[in-house]
Design a protein with these regions (language model features):
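Active-site nucleophile elbow and catalytic-triad environment of alpha/beta-hydrolase enzymes
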Residues: 252-274
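Short beta-strand/loop motif that positions the catalytic acidic residue
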Residues: 278, 284-286
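Alpha/beta-hydrolase-fold enzymes
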Residues: 2-18, 156, 160-257
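Catalytic histidine-centered segment of alpha/beta-hydrolase-like enzymes
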Residues: 319-332
Length: 372
C-alpha cells in the first residue's frame, strides 16, 4: 500500500475475531475520522502544539512515588495516581517516551483518570525524571528486567487489580518486547502501543533529518551530559557524545546498556524479534505523517495482525508523533480518547457486567482488512 486514503481517514487492520468486533464497535473515536485541529493540521504544527501543551500544563501531583532499588545498585520508580480507587479497579501501567517520566506523561494520566476513573501508575526508567543514575548503566529503549521488578511491585501493591499496559513511542517498544518475552505469562490483560517504531534495527535510521538532529541532541543531554558524573570514562560515553544521528547514538551506547556488541544489544531489545509471541489483545496507534516513527515502519509490519490474533492497527493520515490534537478552542488528544475507549471496551468484553441493553452491534468484516 502506498497511500492511506483520503484526508483524515483512519484505517483499521485486524482479524475480525469476536473480541475485536465487539471492541471496534464500542470505540466511537475509531469509527469517526480523525480531524486534526484546523490551525495545526500538518505534522510540524501538531508537534508545535504538543510542545506548547507540555510546556504550559500544570504539573501533576501524584499520590505517591516509590523508588525501587535494583540488584545491581540502579534504581527505577513508580508514580501513582488514583490510589484511592477500589482494590478491584483496573490499573493502567504507563511506559513513557524515550526521555519521558511522570510529568511528561501528565496529560495522558489526567485524561485516563478523567475518562476511566481507573488507577494509573507511570514506570520511570533509570535516570529519568528526578531519578539519579546510580550506576553506569542505561538503555535507550529501557530494560525488560527492570520493568519486571516494577511490575512485581505493582502486583504486590494491587494484587486484585487487572493490569493494562500503555507504551508511548520508545515506551511502546519496551512494552511489546516484554509482552513477547513473557507470552502467556504476562501480567497484562491487554496493551496499547502508541506511535511505535516497530523494528528498532531500522526505525531510527528513518527519522526525518531535522527531527533526527533534534532528538540526537536531546538524547545526548538527557542520557550522557546529565549523568556525566557516573558515565564519564566508561565505554560508550565518549562514542555517544560524538553521535550525529539517533541511530548512531543507540548503537554507540550499547556498552552502557550492558552488551558486548551492537548485535547482542539488538537481539535483546528489538520488540519485533519476539512480537509473534504476544498472547493478549494489542492496539497499535500510528500516524502516516509521523516524522519520527515513519509510515514505512507500519506498512512493513501490517502482517502483525496475522500472527497476533487479537491485534488491531489503527493508522491515521494525520496526527504526527504522539500529538493527535483535535478540536479548535481547547484542543485535546484524539489518541487519549481512543486509548481510554479501547481499554474500557476490552475490560467490558473480558470481564462481562450486567447490561440493560443488548450487545453492541458488530461490524461485518471478513479477513484482514482496512476500514476507513
Amino acid at each position: 500500500m502506498t497511500s492511506v486514503g483520503p484526508p483524515h481517514s483512519t484505517r483499521l487492520y485486524y482479524r475480525p475475531t469476536p473480541l475485536l468486533r465487539e471492541v471496534v464497535a464500542a470505540c466511537s473515536a475509531l469509527a469517526r475520522p480523525f480531524r486534526p485541529t484546523p490551525w495545526a493540521v500538518n505534522r510540524h504544527l501538531q508537534l508545535a502544539l504538543l510542545a506548547f501543551a507540555d510546556g504550559h500544563d500544570l504539573p501533576l501531583l501524584y499520590d505517591r512515588c516509590n523508588v525501587l532499588r535494583l540488584g545491581d545498585g540502579g534504581c527505577v520508580s513508580l508514580e501513582w495516581s488514583g490510589l484511592d480507587a477500589d482494590p478491584a479497579t483496573p490499573t493502567v501501567v504507563v511506559l513513557p517516551t524515550v526521555c519521558g517520566d511522570g510529568q511528561s506523561m501528565r496529560r495522558l494520566v489526567r485524561d485516563l483518570r478523567a475518562h476511566l476513573g481507573w488507577r494509573v501508575v507511570v514506570c520511570n526508567r533509570r535516570g529519568h525524571g528526578t531519578l539519579p543514575l546510580t550506576t553506569p548503566r542505561f538503555s535507550v529503549l529501557g530494560s525488560v528486567a527492570d520493568l519486571r521488578v516494577q511490575l512485581a511491585e505493582i502486583r504486590r501493591q494491587v494484587p486484585g487489580s487487572p493490569l493494562y499496559g500503555v507504551g508511548v513511542s520508545a515506551g511502546s517498544g519496551l512494552l511489546v518486547r516484554a509482552l513477547g518475552e513473557d507470552g502467556d505469562a504476562t501480567p497484562f490483560t491487554a496493551a496499547i502501543a502508541s506511535c511505535p517504531g516497530y523494528d528498532t534495527t531500522r526505525a531510527f535510521g528513518r527519522v526525518h533529518r531535522p527531527y533526527d538532529r533534534y532528538l540526537t541532541r536531546m538524547l545526548k543531554a538527557h542520557f550522557l551530559e546529565r549523568h556525566a558524573y557516573v558515565l564519564r570514562g566508561h565505554a560508550g560515553y565518549a562514542e555517544g557524545l560524538t553521535s550525529r544521528t539517533v541511530e548512531e547514538f543507540q548503537d554507540r551506547c550499547h556498552p552502557l546498556a550492558g552488551f558486548a556488541s551492537v548485535a547482542d544489544y539488538h537481539a535483546a531489545t528489538n520488540p519485533m524479534a519476539v512480537a509473534e509471541r504476544i498472547r493478549v489483545p494489542l492496539l497499535v496507534l500510528n500516524a502516516a505523517d509521523d516524522p519520527v516513527c515513519v509510515v514505512e515502519n507500519v506498512l512493513e509490519h501490517l502482517g502483525l495482525v496475522d500472527v497476533v490474533a487479537e491485534s488491531l492497527i489503527a493508522l491515521t493520515s494525520r496526527g504526527s508523533h504522539c500529538a493527535f490534537f483535535e478540536g479548535t478552542r481547547r484542543p485535546g488528544s484524539w489518541a487519549h480518547r481512543v486509548i481510554a475507549q479501547y481499554l474500557r471496551a476490552v475490560d467490558d468484553a473480558l470481564r462481562p457486567r450486567p447490561r440493560t441493553s443488548g450487545r453492541p452491534e458488530e461490524r461485518a468484516a471478513a479477513g484482514t482488512h482496512p476500514s476507513t
